[in-house]
Swiss-Prot record:
Designated name of the protein: ATP-dependent protease subunit HslV
Entry keywords, A to Z: Allosteric enzyme, Cytoplasm, Hydrolase, Metal-binding, Protease, Sodium, Threonine protease
Catalytic activity: ATP-dependent cleavage of peptide bonds with broad specificity
Organism: Leptospira interrogans serogroup Icterohaemorrhagiae serovar Lai (strain 56601)
Function (record text): Protease subunit of a proteasome-like degradation complex believed to be a general protein degrading machinery.
EC top class, as a word: hydrolase
Assigned protein family: Belongs to the peptidase T1B family. HslV subfamily.
Keyword Cytoplasm among record annotations: yes
GO biological processes: proteolysis involved in protein catabolic process
Lineage: superkingdom: Bacteria
Record text on activity regulation: Allosterically activated by HslU binding.
């Protein structure tokens, strides 16, 4: 029987020298079939002041984007408060608990990974990644972050290309956003 698990995405966020960039690939796969090459998994929220990206089920992620955007409005753009409140609601609501997605959110000051288990993680370094190719992108980005003078945007571009070369669920159709 073919595997119908939906696999997709590499999302990478890099913060360095007062700038932040987030990038995501465009591939969506179901089992061993590529269903779409140009999916947009990166969004700007709160008048472009917050960047976000998702890994996991697209329908679930869009539900979470909506909820997160409401939290951001409710808490006047406070990224940390919005992230904590979304994670709390996600973890405690019976319907939301079934959503299968991870979010990375970032503004000019902070970056967070938010999960349905209630995790709100801020990276020690300026790099965070999720998705099937996340570990490849993370490793590449950390090396470039520590050993080059590349900008966050350049680190994301290079690292995403490396992840796409390694991970079969990640492609080279990269969407990239940055806050300077």
């Amino acid at each position: 029987m073919p595997e119908n698990k939906i696999r997709s995405t590499t999302i990478l966020c890099v913060r360095k020298n007062g700038k932040v960039a987030i990038g995501g690939d465009g591939q969506v796969s179901m089992g061993n079939t590529v269903m779409k090459n140009t999916a947009k998994k990166i969004r700007r929220l709160y008048d472009g002041k917050i960047l976000s990206g998702f890994a996991g089920s697209a329908a679930d992620a869009f539900t979470l984007f909506e909820l997160f955007e409401k939290k951001v409005q409710e808490f006047g753009g406070s990224l940390s408060r919005s992230a904590v409140e979304l994670a709390r609601e996600w973890r405690t609501d019976r319907m939301l608990r079934r959503l299968e997605a991870l979010l990375i959110v970032a503004d000019k000051e902070e970056s967070f990974l938010i999960s349905g288990t209630g995790d709100v993680i801020s990276p020690d370094e300026g790099v965070i990644a999720i998705g099937s190719g996340g570990n490849y992108a993370l490793a590449a980005a950390r090396a470039l972050y520590d050993h080059t003078n590349l900008s966050p945007k350049e680190i994301v571009e290079s690292s995403m290309k490396i992840a796409a070369d390694i991970c079969i669920y990640t492609n080279n159709h990269i969407t990239l956003e940055e806050i300077l």
